[in-house]
Amino acid sequence: MSSKKRSFGDIEFGESDEVGGTNVDVNGEDDFENDDEVESFEDDEQSFEEIEEGGEEGGDNDGEDKGPKKVWRAGVDPLEEDEVLDYDSTAYDMMHSMSVEWPCLSFHPIKDELGAQRNKYPHTMYLVAGTQADEAKNNKVIIMKAKQLHKTKHDDEDSDDDEDSDDDEESDDEDDEDKDVDPELQLAFINHNGAVNRIRSMDQQSNIVATWSDNRSVYIWNIANHLKALDNETVAPKQTAPLHTISNHSIEGYALDWSPKIAGRLATGDCNNSIFVTNASESTWKTDTQAFKGHTESVEDIQWSPSEEKVFASCSIDQTVRIWDIRKPKPAITVKAHTADVNVISWSRNVEYLLVSGCDDGSFRVWDLRAFKDNSPVSDFKYHTGPITSIEWNPYEESQVIVSSSDDQVTIWDFSLEEDTEEFTNANANPDDDFQYPPQLFFIHQGQHDIKEVHWHPQIPHVAISTSIDGFNIFKSSNSEE
């Protein structure tokens, strides 16, 4: 993927756009235009928008029955000038949208001390992101606290319907007593030298964050004071010096990953085919002087092994995925994984021999590392019509991955699903053609433009966050397991 593809296009910032999703085994595609801005914190150019009611043109007309909903397919079905997509809140348990001053190519959820596997609404979460501003001097690392993220399912129902609700809804209210309270977004900033190509927080110490800058430097930051300022609602200093700067790279890059096994171990890959490993010591950081060389074109992504502290994987524009042992400068295994650029990879934390790769041609493949060789994926999916920009295994469901693409879709896939019933076939067939959704396609989220990354939240099961030129979406599909 070229650097031009990685960056946001020349789109005017600040325009409102549409958001929506599809629970593909239940509902049709849903979408609508955001209208209501909710409380912003510290800067009126940052806003939090609650997803509420469907688009005016796309909804029901005087109660007229328009028949079964039909899923709209990005890149396949035309959308006429007088047509809009409908948003149905029942497709989501939760759906919120937020915007900041400049779009963010990359972000990462921050592990917090609020507990793991928390399901009770409203939710609170912390994120860290990096901007792509109009000028290099305007770029920032943004530390975010989003709170009062309440359940939005059935938000578009009339109050009369609420009065008719039964014990089931009363039970829901017990889990979300503050559902009518507006969500809030609090922000803290660090001035950043250059656009942020990628940003990641350390697993073991989430206040330690690494950023890949387009000025060819990798910076390591301590954002502990900024997180504390968000909790205390005070102002943190924007002029914060990095803990360390990695200057070994001769050109900018995008590949960046912290080891889940060794605290302070960071791998970085650049557009000149080089990979460096940095380790933290008691008083400083040390980057190996010898680069890991093997790729013949730009290194696009890196993933450390979830079980082997000295092993990592990388992918490249050279169409390969390579497995490395840091005790050797050359790759241990090289596999031609795709027939185009390999943009992203994810190594499963739950099933340590599974790796998934996303390609510039819109396909993604699942690999069994116990039998890792050329053109031998376990599965090969060719649903998306644009390059895959992000991919990640679900930490709470070993058979699921979430995928984002430049075709303006985020999709959730469940490899445990099979097309084994006539009911499924009939529910997803389009009467106008022979197109059918793959049986493993679990959910479709649409409405954002130029989507760059998507991540699962590590402590709130089945909640996903995506970033695009429009801002961020935080959502949970209604068909997710609790």
From Swiss-Prot:
<feature type="region of interest" description="Disordered">
    <location>
        <begin position="148"/>
        <end position="180"/>
    </location>
</feature>
<keyword id="KW-0539">Nucleus</keyword>
<keyword id="KW-0853">WD repeat</keyword>
<keyword id="KW-0677">Repeat</keyword>
<dbReference type="Pfam" id="PF00400">
    <property type="entry name" value="WD40"/>
</dbReference>
<dbReference type="GO" id="GO:0042254">
    <property type="term" value="P:ribosome biogenesis"/>
</dbReference>
<feature type="region of interest" description="Disordered">
    <location>
        <begin position="1"/>
        <end position="75"/>
    </location>
</feature>
<feature type="repeat" description="WD 5">
    <location>
        <begin position="446"/>
        <end position="482"/>
    </location>
</feature>
<feature type="compositionally biased region" description="Acidic residues">
    <location>
        <begin position="157"/>
        <end position="180"/>
    </location>
</feature>
<feature type="repeat" description="WD 3">
    <location>
        <begin position="337"/>
        <end position="377"/>
    </location>
</feature>
<feature type="repeat" description="WD 2">
    <location>
        <begin position="294"/>
        <end position="334"/>
    </location>
</feature>
<dbReference type="InterPro" id="IPR036322">
    <property type="entry name" value="WD40_repeat_dom_sf"/>
</dbReference>
<dbReference type="InterPro" id="IPR020472">
    <property type="entry name" value="G-protein_beta_WD-40_rep"/>
</dbReference>
<feature type="repeat" description="WD 4">
    <location>
        <begin position="383"/>
        <end position="423"/>
    </location>
</feature>
<protein>
    <recommendedName>
        <fullName>Glutamate-rich WD repeat-containing protein 1</fullName>
    </recommendedName>
</protein>
<feature type="compositionally biased region" description="Acidic residues">
    <location>
        <begin position="27"/>
        <end position="63"/>
    </location>
</feature>
<dbReference type="InterPro" id="IPR051972">
    <property type="entry name" value="Glutamate-rich_WD_repeat"/>
</dbReference>
<dbReference type="Pfam" id="PF12265">
    <property type="entry name" value="CAF1C_H4-bd"/>
</dbReference>
<dbReference type="InterPro" id="IPR015943">
    <property type="entry name" value="WD40/YVTN_repeat-like_dom_sf"/>
</dbReference>
<dbReference type="InterPro" id="IPR001680">
    <property type="entry name" value="WD40_rpt"/>
</dbReference>
<feature type="repeat" description="WD 1">
    <location>
        <begin position="191"/>
        <end position="231"/>
    </location>
</feature>
<dbReference type="GO" id="GO:0005730">
    <property type="term" value="C:nucleolus"/>
</dbReference>
<dbReference type="InterPro" id="IPR022052">
    <property type="entry name" value="Histone-bd_RBBP4-like_N"/>
</dbReference>
